[in-house]
């Protein structure tokens, strides 16, 4: 008799519960997250078992071990799974059983499992973004120190350019001693971060940028040599999205719709989206609007039509949504971006 297995994964251990075709559940089994113990437990399960596990922050190695053991893994969307379980009580065993029941009933809300090599390559782009965020944070701290002690100047437009660095070095002695040391440490850290970011970007240019999908995405307005790899790697297999709108929604560019009693209202964007992909398309939209090239004037026209009525934020999101949906068709049809005959600005959202 076939069994359906639910795995409630935590940082240090997982709880497994099996449910058979009649809905009878096994006793919960707790397995510590020691790789050998985990692998040995998986070997004891029936061959090619169906296992459901939530996409928590540490699922990579757990899924790898399950697939290595020959099992069929189903990655569950945590928020949707909890809604469908509909429980008021929560225990590890109940969560594992709930996943197993959803899997058995064919109602498990599944997420796509990116292949291992793709997950690994994503780390290049995601680490670059993290280092850039850290660099911005350090720059803000230095700017704040300069302002606190009245050392700002209008003669230098970029405090971290060549002239800006020279200016900071010449005024460093005017800070209190400990503040001066901390500013210098942060300046040194910025140089190290810049070197690491450049090293990562060079790796991206060599290992990822030459790919045919990346080259196609570079035809999208505002998408350059870094944004194209981000978009490609975060999308993965575009065929997992049935429609272009599904990709835009996954990227957090489609507002939620609430309808009741004949009234429809648009809500905000869900927080549970791919934030990396959202950032990439919004960044591309901002770049496309800033450049205002004749070839992509239709993008600026869409932005300008929405700007007066909805403001910059919503207008940019609308442009980003257009770019996301265009990227879907570019990857599906394997064609370069072409300006649409007509952009409909009255689309909801």
Sequence positions of predicted segments:
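Phosphate-backbone recognition surface of nucleic-acid-processing proteins
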Residues: 36, 84-87, 91, 216-219, ...
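Glycine-rich, often acidic, oxyanion-interacting loops/wings at catalytic, nucleic-acid
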Residues: 126-216
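Short helix-capping/linker segments at secondary-structure and domain boundaries
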Residues: 106-109, 138-139, 197-200, 236-240, ...
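Short alpha-helix plus adjacent loop in nuclease-associated cores
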Residues: 67, 74-126, 166-169, 261-276
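Basic, amphipathic alpha-helical segments enriched in Lys/Arg and hydrophobic/aromatic residues
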Residues: 307-349
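Glycine/alanine-rich phosphate-binding loops at beta-alpha junctions
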Residues: 1-74, 83
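Charged, often Cys/His-bearing segments associated with DNA-binding zinc-finger transcription factors
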Residues: 1-3, 14, 149, 336-337, ...
């Amino acid at each position: 008799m076939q069994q359906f297995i639910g795995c409630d994964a935590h940082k240090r251990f997982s709880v497994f519960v099996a449910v058979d075709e009649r809905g009878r559940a096994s006793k919960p089994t707790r397995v510590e997250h020691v790789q050998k113990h985990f692998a040995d437990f998986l070997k004891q399960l029936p061959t090619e078992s169906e296992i459901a596990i939530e996409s928590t922050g540490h699922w990579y190695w757990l899924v790898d071990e399950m697939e290595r053991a020959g099992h069929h893994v189903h990655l569950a969307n945590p928020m949707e799974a909890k809604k469908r379980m509909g429980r008021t009580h929560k225990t590890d065993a109940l969560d594992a059983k709930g996943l197993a029941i959803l899997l058995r009933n064919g109602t498990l809300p599944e997420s796509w499992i990116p292949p291992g090599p793709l997950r690994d390559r994503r780390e290049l782009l995601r680490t670059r973004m993290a280092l850039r965020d850290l660099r911005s944070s350090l720059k803000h701290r230095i700017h704040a120190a300069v302002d606190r002690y009245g050392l700002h100047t209008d003669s230098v437009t970029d405090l971290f350019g060549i002239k800006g660095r020279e200016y900071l070095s010449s005024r460093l002695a005017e800070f209190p001693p400990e503040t001066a040391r901390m500013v210098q440490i942060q300046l040194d850290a910025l140089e190290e971060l810049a070197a690491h970011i450049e090293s990562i970007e060079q790796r991206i240019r060599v290992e990822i940028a030459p790919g045919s999908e990346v080259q196609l995405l570079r035809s999208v307005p505002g998408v350059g040599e870094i944004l194209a790899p981000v978009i490609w790697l975060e999308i993965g297999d575009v065929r997992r999205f049935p429609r272009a709108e599904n990709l835009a929604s996954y990227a957090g560019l489609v507002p939620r719709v609430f309808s009741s009693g004949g009234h429809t209202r648009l809500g905000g964007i869900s927080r549970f989206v791919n934030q990396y992909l959202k950032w990439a398309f919004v960044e591309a939209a901002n770049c496309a609007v800033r450049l205002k090239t004749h070839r992509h004037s239709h993008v600026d026209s869409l932005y300008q039509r929405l700007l007066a009525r909805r403001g910059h934020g919503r207008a940019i999101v609308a442009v980003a949504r257009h770019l996301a949906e265009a990227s879907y068709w570019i990857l599906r049809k394997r064609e370069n971006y072409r300006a649409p005959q007509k952009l409909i600005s009255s689309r909801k959202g």
